[in-house]
């Protein structure tokens, strides 16, 4: 499971997901990518589930790059706890993903294998996504 080794602050504010992604919007490492079309918090479990789905379909051929990292702690209060008495304890980690962000990349497999692998990975994520090919490979 992905999570930071250590953080400066244990708890952070929720924040807002305004606008499109400014960074990480182009394919940098592989030939194929999975681009987010909606804003969302992607949990470390969802990232791991998508990674496993891709690895299983690609039969460990090729290489996968995970371009997002869950660096935001999400807190939760215990069940049946009254309001007040401070903020809850950190429960899990999320990555803040905005539209246009490349979340996963792959290389070393044929186009049809990559397309299906990313389709299976996209099913594990709570947002709409788009399969993209590096511009110099199209045509």
UniProtKB/Swiss-Prot annotation:
Biological process, per Gene Ontology: translation
Gene3D superfamilies assigned: Ribosomal protein L10e/L16 (3.90.1170.10)
GO molecular function: rRNA binding; structural constituent of ribosome; tRNA binding
This protein's record includes keyword rRNA-binding: yes
Keyword DNA-binding: no
Transmembrane segments: none
A GO cellular component entry from the record: cytosolic large ribosomal subunit
Key words of the record: Ribonucleoprotein, Ribosomal protein, RNA-binding, rRNA-binding, tRNA-binding
InterPro entries, alphabetized: Ribosomal_uL16, Ribosomal_uL16_bact-type, Ribosomal_uL16_CS, Ribosomal_uL16_dom, Ribosomal_uL16_sf
Assembly and binders: Part of the 50S ribosomal subunit.
Role of this protein: Binds 23S rRNA and is also seen to make contacts with the A and possibly P site tRNAs.
Family, per entry: Belongs to the universal ribosomal protein uL16 family.
Name of this chain's protein: Large ribosomal subunit protein uL16
Species of the source: Chlorobium phaeobacteroides (strain BS1)
Lineage, opening ranks: Bacteria, Pseudomonadati, Chlorobiota, Chlorobiia, Chlorobiales
Name of the encoding gene: rplP
